Amino acid sequence: MPESTKSESTMSETYRHFTRLFPYPHERIAVGAPATDAMARYDELAQLVHTERFVPFFLNLTDTVRESMVIPVSLEHDIIDDGETLTPEQVSAYTRAILQRYRTARDAASAEEYGSAAIAQQLRRVMDDGEEANEDDPDDFNLNKLMGEFMSSDFLPDEEPEDDAPCLCALLRYELVDEEDKGEMLLLQIPTDDPADIPAYLPFGGWNDCPDAETQLAFTHYWREKYGAIPAALDGADCLEFLVERPVTDPVEAKNLAVEQFAFCSDLPFQVFEDFEQLTEFIHQSRQWYFWWD
């Protein structure tokens, strides 16, 4: 079951540093706690979003996570990326700056209009990177050809709907571990009434092929508007999960969504799933999405 407090002796240095910089109200989930219990508590808190002005979010906190969140804030303020140097006020200033840049760039466009353009731009970047890799290694697969064949194929996902209530993979894994060094699961209360803003409050990404916070905001606002999809859990520094209120039900639209998710996480159809077809099967009518970056 969730624990709201622990004794000082059980507080890790990672936890102390994180909560000093990100002083969001939270509950601590005991290692081995049933995932269904944690999900039930999440659902309870989610009912309070509009009255209490916060959104729940699971974070499996590790030192790598803490460091990955310190770096973008440090870069924003042009200071050494030292968790001891930063202040909570600088973290708040970072959040405000990221949100303001997103809103300024979006201007009068709707979340869906701006998101569509941003996703197209991100997809071009990913495809260009794949094309360059193919030029360096002609024996490697041709990404542009692969994408074209997928979109023009007759493949459509199965029509069978998903009946089971969603349960986040991060919680299922945490239920099975029995070592404290696997991280500590926190159920945070992020101080916003818009879950699409979470990337600005918990900065991660901007490394390898993981988009930075500003790019993530374009995706999260677009997907929230279109599917009611919201970020729900960050498992370590490289696994992000969404819960989806209005799953995609049209098979052709599911293929298009698979391409959008590829733009967001280019490792998805090749390292998490076997191919675009398997990714499409997973997201079609699914109430949860999963992303992992190498």
Label each region the model flagged.
Residues 1-12:
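Compositionally biased, intrinsically disordered low-complexity segments enriched
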Residues 12-195:
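Extended, low-hydrophobicity segments enriched in charged/polar residues
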Residues 29-30, 158-160, 203-205, 211-217, ...:
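N-terminal start-of-chain detector that recognizes signal peptides
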Residues 71-74, 200-203, 244-247, 255-257:
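Surface-exposed beta-strand edges and their flanking turn/coil or helix-capping segments
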Residues 177-224:
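Surface-exposed, low-hydrophobicity interaction/linker segments
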Residues 214-217, 221, 226, 231-294:
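Alpha-helical oligomerization segments
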